[in-house]
């Protein structure tokens, strides 16, 4: 008895990636694009053509202000073509960021990003991060109950 097994798909139709492959792609995005040791050109191999330049520019803008950034993934969940990532970044404010001069302060903040994967690349992404906390840590937003000027005691 012989058994022959093969897979036939519709012409032009892509075989969906597995949940693990999608999670691995998101891990690579964090390591290869967002961490200070990564290359900005990694965006071209990680993102769909329509998204690559915007992703590269966002990473460049952030890394200009925080050149030593290290991002770690705390949790990843994948279902179908979607991946959710909870991540944490640590860095030192060493360059201009959103018009704010370098403070030299170390920061730590978290975020959650959602991705849609298509054809082995990130087709869309949405991120919610603690920008308020980040701005407070670099001194752009005063701590509650503290004025900008020192009050005499």
Language model: regions and residue ranges:
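C-terminal and inter-domain tail/linker signature
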Residues: 2-153
């Amino acid at each position: 008895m012989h058994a022959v097994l093969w897979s036939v798909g519709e012409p032009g139709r892509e075989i969906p990636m597995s949940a693990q492959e999608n999670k691995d792609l998101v891990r690579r995005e964090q390591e290869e694009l967002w961490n200070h040791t990564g290359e900005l050109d990694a965006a071209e191999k990680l993102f769909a053509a329509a998204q690559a330049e915007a992703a590269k520019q966002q990473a460049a803008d952030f890394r200009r202000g925080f050149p030593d950034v290290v991002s770690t993934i705390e949790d990843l969940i994948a279902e179908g073509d979607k991946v959710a990532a909870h991540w944490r970044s640590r860095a030192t404010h060493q360059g201009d960021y959103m018009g704010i001069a370098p403070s030299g302060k170390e920061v730590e903040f978290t975020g959650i990003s959602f991705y849609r994967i298509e054809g082995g690349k990130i087709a869309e992404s949405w991120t919610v991060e603690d920008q308020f906390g980040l701005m407070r840590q670099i001194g752009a937003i005063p701590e509650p109950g503290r004025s900008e000027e020192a009050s005499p005691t």
